[in-house]
From Swiss-Prot:
Its cofactor is FAD. This is Kynurenine 3-monooxygenase. Transmembrane segments: none annotated. One of its GO terms (cellular component) is peroxisome. It is an enzyme of class 1 (oxidoreductase). It catalyses: L-kynurenine + NADPH + O2 + H(+) = 3-hydroxy-L-kynurenine + NADP(+) + H2O. GO terms for molecular function: FAD binding; kynurenine 3-monooxygenase activity; NAD(P)H oxidase H2O2-forming activity. It comes from the Eukaryota. Belongs to the aromatic-ring hydroxylase family. KMO subfamily. InterPro entries: FAD-bd (IPR002938), FAD/NAD-bd_sf (IPR036188), Kynurenine_monooxygenase (IPR027545). It comes from Scheffersomyces stipitis (strain ATCC 58785 / CBS 6054 / NBRC 10063 / NRRL Y-11545). The keyword Oxidoreductase applies.
């Protein structure tokens, strides 16, 4: 038996219930509230203010905020975006660390000095939660576990969501009624599962043969140090080692959040903390010096190994246009293009712009959203998966570097003068006006041109070499 609670919206527009108080759910709540809706946000976890920070950050890959995410923040609240962006650290490119620990190579991201931006996931989530606490139109209920969705199939019915309070095993479930409901509860979405029980939804879940382990580079406290950062804070640091790699992103306090990615077979072949230290010292000698034995041993013994999973689903809305999934609940991707959060925030912006276009008709907007978004979400999920190979292996390949240099040169000096040319990374990270699918289509055409240029160039070099060799041989015979 459950207790029905209908949210009072008598002095407001219609009521919206959102499941998931992560990054995307919080931004969605702020976006709906800004449009005049009464919002209730449900979260399974306890209030972050009551949880020790060290427990929250054990499995939190730092975020790279780029133009798509920033545009979505500014769409919802320009002043809020400015407050958040005060705490970012710009990263102008990748810094590639070699196997000796003595050489580093910068590979710039932007054509004209553009940067992506490092920010701590927990900090950003706290910022969004703090913004919601200033709103009279958003009610946040922590420790609420979704157990059932109902009334999703008939036009004349209003959706309901049933929750249990995880703090009280004896409490009766409570059922809440809303005009519209949104699932933003992550890759393991209970909201999505409940939708699937009552409607036809394509769904695929794929675990990637990859684990991640979080590490930490402390601030530089050496006497006489000129910076609190041990390595350049304005780069995303990568230690590429073909089938495994280490990355590090700067934090405002001078520390770096570092993450080790590898196939499960690699980490499982290491049988002890001491073996882990030896492995780390051999493969990442400069990072080893910054972390030290004690930290590496603690990480091996205490930090959980995270799994990487890709989730796709379609459609994202229910038949009546009253329920929808966004963010990782609809499209969980691997973190290798830095677009997971940016894409989720863009989901919110695209949905809100549809509501604007449809003059506040949320039902029509929910129904249009699936077709409007699918090809872009499919495109970025695939691109994120493909980019692991680039980050872990190709960034050190001479042919790759030549190709990237040519791509960069054409984008910087030829684009807009001789012909249109934009590198893929520029389109994905810095051109929020170009949808993901369109960016990849443009890149495909440009890649064909680059392939032909490379073939012609290599053929010309080979012919030149053959002619020179023939001339040398002719002189030798004389």
């Amino acid at each position: 038996m459950s207790v029905l609670e209908s949210v009072d919206t008598s002095n407001r527009h219609q009521g919206v219930g959102i499941v998931g108080a992560g990054l995307v759910g919080c931004l969605a709540a702020l976006a709906f509230a800004a449009k005049g809706y009464s919002v209730t946000l449900f979260e399974l976890r306890p209030d972050p203010k009551t949880v020790d920070a060290s427990e929250r950050n054990l499995r939190s890959i730092n975020l790279a905020v780029s133009n798509r995410g920033i545009r979505a923040l500014k769409y919802v609240d320009d002043a809020m975006a400015d407050r958040i962006l005060e705490h970012i650290i710009p990263m102008k490119g990748r810094m590639i660390h070699d196997t000796t620990g003595t050489k580093q190579e910068s590979q710039l991201y932007g054509l004209f000095g553009e940067s992506i931006n490092s920010i701590d996931r927990g900090f950003l989530n706290d910022c969004l939660l703090a913004e919601m606490r200033h709103s009279d139109d958003i009610n946040v209920l922590f420790n609420h576990k979704l157990v059932q969705l109902d009334h999703l199939m008939r036009e004349d019915e209003t959706p309901t969501m049933t929750f249990v309070d995880t703090r009280d095993n004896k409490a009766e479930p409570k059922t809440f009624e809303f005009d519209y409901i949104v699932g933003a509860d992550g890759a393991h979405s209970q909201f999505r599962y409940q939708m699937q029980r009552s409607m036809r939804m394509d769904f695929q879940q794929k675990y990637i043969d990859m684990q991640y382990l979080e590490l930490y580079i402390p601030p530089n406290t050496l006497e006489g140090a000129t910076s609190k950062f041990s390595i350049d804070p304005n780069h995303l640091h990568i230690w590429p080692r073909h089938n495994f790699m280490l990355i590090a992103l700067a934090n405002k306090d001078g520390s770096f959040t570092s993450t080790f990615f590898s196939p499960w077979s690699v980490i499982e072949s290491i049988k002890s903390a001491q073996e882990w230290v030896v492995f780390f010292k051999k493969n990442f000698p400069d990072a080893y010096k910054l972390m030290g034995d004690d930290h590496l041993i603690s990480v091996y013994e205490s930090n959980p190994r995270g799994t990487l999973m890709q989730v796709t689903a379609y459609p994202y809305h229910n038949p009546t246009g009253r329920a929808i999934i966004i963010g990782d609940a609809a499209h969980s991707m691997v973190p290798f293009y830095g677009q997971g959060m940016n894409c989720g925030f863009e989901d919110v912006r695209v949905l809100m712009e549809l509501i604007d276009t449809n003059h506040g008709n949320v039902t029509k907007s929910f129904k249009q959203y699936s077709d409007a978004r699918k090809k872009d979400l499919d495109a970025i999920c695939k691109l994120a998966l493909d980019n692991y190979h680039e980050m872990s292996s190709k960034v050190t390949s001479p042919l790759y570097l030549i190709r990237k240099k040519l791509d960069y040169t054409l984008g910087k000096y030829a684009n807009g003068t001789l012909f249109q040319w934009l590198p893929l990374y520029t389109m994905i990270s810095f051109r929020d006006d170009i949808p993901y699918a369109k960016a990849i289509a443009i890149e495909k055409r440009q890649a064909t041109i680059l392939n032909r240029v490379q073939i012609v160039s290599l053929t010309a070099l080979a012919l030149y070499g053959a002619v020179k060799a023939a001339q040398c041989w002719d002189r030798f015979r004389r």
